[in-house]
């Protein structure tokens, strides 16, 4: 079972399109949020995010998870 907190973190990143901005919004550190997302991806066995220099983009699996988690 996926923790609700992890889904909230994921949705914030999807909304902000930035791990840094999502971390600020969620009042957690950027490294903590990044690690949580890597753990979520590992648990699901799917890449959810494409991490660019300026922007985070959802993969197809990430977009699917977003649609189900909202």
Predicted regions and their residues:
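Short, basic/aromatic recognition patches that contact phosphate-bearing ligands
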Residues: 5, 10
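Short helix-boundary/capping micro-motifs
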Residues: 11-27, 53
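Alpha-helical residues within the helix-turn-helix
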Residues: 24-25, 42, 63
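Residues in the recognition helix of alpha-helical DNA-binding motifs
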Residues: 36
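A short LG(V/I)-centered, amphipathic sequence patch enriched
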Residues: 41-58
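Coiled-coil helix of the DHp
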Residues: 62, 66-70
């Amino acid at each position: 079972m996926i923790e609700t907190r992890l889904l909230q973190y994921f949705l914030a990143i999807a909304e902000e399109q930035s791990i840094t901005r999502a971390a600020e919004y969620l009042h957690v550190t950027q490294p903590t949020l990044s690690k949580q997302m890597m753990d979520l991806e590992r648990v699901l066995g799917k890449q959810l995010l494409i991490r660019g220099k300026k922007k985070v983009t959802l993969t197809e699996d990430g977009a699917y998870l977003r649609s189900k988690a909202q």
